[in-house]
Amino acid sequence: MGGLEPCSRLLLLPLLLAVGGLRPVQAQAQSDCSCSTVSPGVLAGIVLGDLVLTVLIALAVYFLGRLVPRGRGAAEAATRKQRITETESPYQELQGQRSDVYSDLNTQRPYYK
């Protein structure tokens, strides 16, 4: 079974459920239970229907996502670059080493010596 494609494995599932000898799901105490039974074909149909619906939803989201424009055209990118170059930097330029900024810290805390 290692050489089968995933699609053929998926189609093999109902066959295995039907031929594999699975009995319908039944209650343990049949005498006083009015439960309905679920055949393997119905169970396989539910599972396959769920898988198909999940794949269809994923494909719909993928294709609808491709239809939405991203809004990053060439003209918009050029104006964005221009806006970035026009804005002023919020950072200060480095001014070299200044010893007077922290010189008073050593005199205030002598217990660190």
From Swiss-Prot:
Region (Disordered): 75-113
Function comment: Adapter protein which non-covalently associates with activating receptors found on the surface of a variety of immune cells to mediate signaling and cell activation following ligand binding by the receptors. TYROBP is tyrosine-phosphorylated in the ITAM domain following ligand binding by the associated receptors which leads to activation of additional tyrosine kinases and subsequent cell activation. Also has an inhibitory role in some cells. Non-covalently associates with activating receptors of the CD300 family to mediate cell activation.
Gene this protein is translated from: TYROBP
Free-text description of this protein's post-translational modifications in UniProt: Following ligand binding by associated receptors, tyrosine phosphorylated in the ITAM domain which leads to activation of additional tyrosine kinases and subsequent cell activation.
Membrane topology value: Single-pass type I membrane protein
Chief localization: membrane
GO biological process: apoptotic cell clearance; microglial cell activation involved in immune response; negative regulation of B cell proliferation; negative regulation of transforming growth factor beta1 production; neutrophil activation involved in immune response; positive regulation of macrophage fusion; positive regulation of microglial cell mediated cytotoxicity; positive regulation of natural killer cell activation
GO function terms (MF aspect): metal ion binding; protein homodimerization activity; signaling receptor binding
Subcellular location: Cell membrane
InterPro entries (UniProt xref): Tyrobp
Complex and partners: Homodimer; disulfide-linked. Homotrimer; disulfide-linked. Homotetramer; disulfide-linked. Homotrimers and homotetramers form when low levels of partner receptors are available and is competitive with assembly with interacting receptors. They may represent alternative oligomerization states or may be intermediates in the receptor assembly process. Binding of a metal cation aids in homooligomerization through coordination of the metal ion by the subunits of the oligomer. Interacts with TREM1. Interacts with TREM2. Interacts with CLECSF5. Interacts with CD300LB and CD300C2.
Annotated residues for binding of Ca(2+): 50
Name of the protein in its database record: TYRO protein tyrosine kinase-binding protein
Record's compositionally biased regions (Polar residues): 87-113
Superkingdom per UniProt: Eukaryota
Any single GO CC term annotated in Swiss-Prot or TrEMBL for this entry: plasma membrane
